[in-house]
Amino acid sequence: TAQYIMQILLEQAENSPIHTLLLFSVLSLTHYKDLPVFQKNLRVSTKNKEVSLQPQKCFFKQSFEVSKFKDFVLRKHRLNTVNSFTIPLPQYYLENLSQLKKMDGVEIDSKIQEYLQKINKGLTFQLTTQNLPRLISDIALNELGYELESKLLAGENVNNYTPCHYFSTKIIDILDIYIQT
């Protein structure tokens, strides 16, 4: 299902500002209205996420807390407790997104709804602007659930299992699969 959705978005993103916006929403795990496309500051940064839509810096960065023990020892030795990945975006995405500034907000909303309805025809669930940004993270969490379940069924101890490294590598793997298709 996710591969089907990503394929549609990737195929159309080169030529359609709306598809570029939806694709960027999925890739950056951010609702499209919260992307810096519609703001004066073209960079948004929070504790775990950074989105930049500047001409020389078009990327998003996501980080995950990897330590279950945020104690003094880790801080004292400055051990890396965060795993992160950065995905640069092609320049034409930025050019497409800048075209959206010429459009009215109501027009953008209606076009997004129109495109989501077209995508929904091939789905077994309702794709919305709210669940679209969670698409990749939900896939990763589902796969993580299967991995944990298989470890438990195999009788392995999962008390000290830390999924952090899994997230960053798996999401990149998933994106690579989408790009290749």
Annotate the PLM regions.
Residues S25, P36-Q39, S150-K151:
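The alpha-helix within a helix-turn-helix
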Residues S67-Q126, L135:
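Active-site/catalytic core of tyrosine-dependent DNA strand-transfer enzymes
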Residues L153-T181:
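Catalytic-site neighborhood detector that most strongly recognizes the C-terminal catalytic loop/helix
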